[in-house]
């Protein structure tokens, strides 16, 4: 029974494969029912239905039996992937795509694929098999042989099959298929829809086809086994997250996606309205709404939230993305760590991985000092080591070091001059000079030192460095023949940032050269805590403006609250305040971050006005939040995990585009529908927008 929806009358028509009788310019359809009660439809309504919906199907100049082409979909008995040896002898009905088709003598073999798997079917050319076509322009010629007619069935066409499950001969069992022990002997094969030549084959290796082409025809790319697997795992993980959080007494609440513009950090997408000068913004996160839910007594909230940020894109970013967003009342950091570790372990278990250790903690100072980045990959070594004390600024003959160490610093500890290095252990001679050139090209402030035999140093500084300096560094770094040393000198924030990026670049280079091997199923989780609450816009300028390290709603560390409230505090004092912020990191990827929030309106107002020095009109944008905080707001905190990024880690992909059904390109374009698109002048005028 086919069910067609009339747009105008909103009446469901149940077409029962009964004759359609031409009556002047209208159709008389038999057995017309509504979803509730039987209705009489006027000829005019049916004329409209005929004109709008059957124009491309019915050719009035041809005397054809339309009824033969009307589909009568019978419920399938099995999906393609669920038929097993337990079903041998049963008659089954399946639907799917023709994945492959081979003519082998007296048999034609078809592998049929649906969203649940694949199954092999065969047509015995010596036996009776009914072939049908429901495609208007493709007819089965009864005069032709089955072999001739089956040529009409192209790869990726949609078919239905009715047949009997039989056991494969033992030598023909395919252990690579879940249905490899059986096959279906076809009694009836019906073509439901044909397929034109595709831009690429569904069986292709993704590296053999450009990503641009795959995204343009994403609906074809989605048929690939790998993409199907990714999307289905994403669904399973989402359900596991919901179940876990609901069991932890959370409730799921949807917050608005039309918000008001607020200065939270990243650039927002603005949504014009038909009211002149009035704009919505798409939320960068549900941050303010979820805090307001805590004011409203929701206690524990979560949602799989859609978020939007108009920023430069990379492989792990999209203009619209999803996060597992959470907020809790009457909570401290330890409670959040415990809940999130439990959630992460649950989600990894759903994907087939067992995480059985407690996540270690690092302070922000520790990770920057040791790894040069606040989201370190701890699966490999190459730690930053401070060798500043190996040089005396008054005695060293290395002018670069002498000048750098003589530079004055200010009250920002990040401006202090340092010399740091990382060691590439036993990489020579595989690591060639061209590779070292690549490293220095990537960062021109890096000095390379190759350790040759007899502790000979090959470097730009080898003639200037003293034996004492060389000995101190050799002992500090435990240098051996075949090692490479990468040195950077300058203000601390520059040195650590440079070496942090160089460490990542070197790790990728060493992986390409098979000098570093990482297990794709090794997951090194860690927490980073004690971030600075505020960050100077310029470490070299003591009077530079301060920015929120994360967002302006993060609460200060209890031990540092006096620095925030002291009216005599300076920017350098504010920069020493630690925030109650925490990031969860895995294998060099920030999986999520959160904080305990400011729940007092006076403290929140001081942050906005006195520390961040927002203009009054900017502060006014937060009036709704400030008012709510003054009306009995409980202490609260929360966190958000990047759901797309989480799923990409579970499928061992470097790009979140691989786990999103319809992703944007790195340029923010959606190639399939050519989005974003231009609009007409009249549409712009309606929104009071002027195109320059």
Curated annotation (Swiss-Prot):
Residues 287-290 are annotated as: Aspartate. It catalyses: tRNA(Asp) + L-aspartate + ATP = L-aspartyl-tRNA(Asp) + AMP + diphosphate. It comes from the Eukaryota. The keyword Membrane does not apply. It is an enzyme of class 6 (ligase). Keywords: Aminoacyl-tRNA synthetase, ATP-binding, Ligase, Mitochondrion, Nucleotide-binding, Protein biosynthesis, Transit peptide. HAMAP family: Asp_tRNA_synth_type1 (MF_00044). This is Aspartate--tRNA ligase, mitochondrial. It comes from Dictyostelium discoideum (Social amoeba). The gene is maspS.
């Amino acid at each position: 029974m086919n069910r067609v929806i009339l747009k105008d009358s909103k009446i469901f028509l149940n077409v029962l494969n009964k004759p359609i009788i031409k009556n002047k310019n209208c159709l008389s359809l038999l057995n017309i029912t509504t979803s509730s009660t039987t209705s009489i439809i006027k000829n005019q309504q049916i004329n409209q239905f005929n004109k709008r919906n059957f124009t491309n199907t019915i050719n009035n100049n041809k005397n054809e039996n339309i009824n033969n082409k009307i589909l009568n979909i019978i419920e399938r008995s099995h999906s393609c992937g669920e038929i097993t040896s337990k079903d041998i002898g049963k008659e089954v009905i399946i639907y799917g795509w023709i994945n492959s088709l081979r003519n082998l003598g007296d048999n034609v073999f078809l592998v049929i694929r649906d969203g649940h798997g694949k199954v092999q079917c065969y047509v015995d050319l010596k036996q009776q098999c009914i072939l049908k076509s429901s495609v208007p322009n493709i007819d089965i010629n009864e005069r032709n042989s089955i072999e001739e007619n089956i040529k009409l069935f192209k790869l990726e066409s949609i078919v239905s099959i009715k047949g009997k499950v039989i056991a494969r001969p033992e030598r023909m069992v395919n252990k690579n298929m879940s249905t490899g022990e059986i096959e279906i002997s076809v009694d009836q094969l019906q073509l439901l829809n044909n397929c034109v030549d595709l831009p690429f084959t569904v069986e292709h290796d993704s590296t053999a086809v450009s990503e641009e082409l795959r995204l343009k025809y994403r609906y074809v790319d989605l048929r690939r086994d790998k993409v199907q697997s990714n999307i289905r795992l994403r669904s399973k993980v989402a359900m596991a997250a919901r179940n876990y959080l609901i069991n932890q007494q959370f409730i799921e609440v949807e917050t608005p996606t039309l918000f008001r513009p607020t200065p939270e950090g990243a650039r927002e997408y603005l949504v014009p309205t038909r009211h002149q000068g009035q704009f919505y913004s798409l939320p960068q996160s549900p941050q303010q709404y979820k805090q307001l839910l805590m004011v409203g007594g929701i206690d524990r909230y979560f949602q799989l939230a859609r978020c939007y940020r108009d920023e430069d894109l990379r492989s792990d970013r999209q203009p619209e993305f999803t996060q597992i967003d959470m907020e809790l009342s009457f909570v401290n950091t330890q409670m959040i760590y415990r809940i999130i570790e439990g959630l992460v372990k649950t989600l990894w278990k759903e994907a087939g991985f067992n995480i059985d250790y407690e996540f270690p903690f690092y302070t922000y100072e520790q990770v920057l000092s040791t790894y040069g980045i606040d989201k370190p990959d701890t699966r490999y070594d190459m730690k930053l080591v401070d060798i500043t004390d190996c040089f005396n600024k008054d005695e060293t003959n290395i002018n670069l070091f002498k000048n750098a160490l003589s530079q004055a610093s200010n009250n920002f500890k990040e401006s202090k001059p340092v010399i740091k290095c990382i060691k590439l252990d036993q990489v020579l001679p595989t690591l060639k000079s061209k590779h070292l050139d690549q490293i220095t090209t990537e960062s021109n402030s890096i000095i390379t030192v190759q350790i040759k035999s007899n502790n000979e140093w090959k470097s730009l500084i080898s003639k200037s460095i003293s034996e004492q300096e060389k000995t101190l560094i050799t002992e500090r770094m435990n240098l051996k023949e075949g090692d490479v040393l990468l040195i950077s000198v300058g203000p601390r924030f520059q040195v650590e940032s440079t070496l942090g990026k160089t460490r990542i670049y070197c790790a990728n280079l060493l992986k390409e050269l098979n000098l570093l091997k990482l297990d794709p199923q090794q997951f090194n989780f860690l927490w980073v805590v004690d971030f600075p609450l505020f960050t100077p816009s310029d470490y070299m300028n003591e009077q530079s403006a301060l920015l929120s390290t994360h967002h302006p709603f993060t609460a200060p560390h209890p031990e540092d609250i006096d620095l925030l409230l002291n009216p005599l505090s300076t920017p350098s004092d504010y920069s020493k305040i630690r925030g109650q912020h925490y990031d969860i990191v895995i294998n060099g990827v920030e999986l999520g971050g959160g904080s305990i929030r400011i729940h007092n309106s006076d403290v929140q107002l001081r942050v906005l006005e006195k520390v961040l020095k927002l203009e009054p009109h900017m502060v006014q944008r937060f009036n709704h939040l400030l008012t709510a905080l003054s009306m009995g707001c409980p202490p609260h905190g929360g966190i958000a995990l990047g759901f797309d990024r989480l799923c990409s880690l579970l499928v061992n992909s470097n790009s979140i585009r691989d786990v999103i059904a319809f992703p944007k390109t790195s340029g923010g374009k959606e190639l399939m529908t050519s989005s974003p698109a231009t609009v007409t002048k009249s549409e712009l005028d309606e929104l009071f927008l002027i195109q320059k």
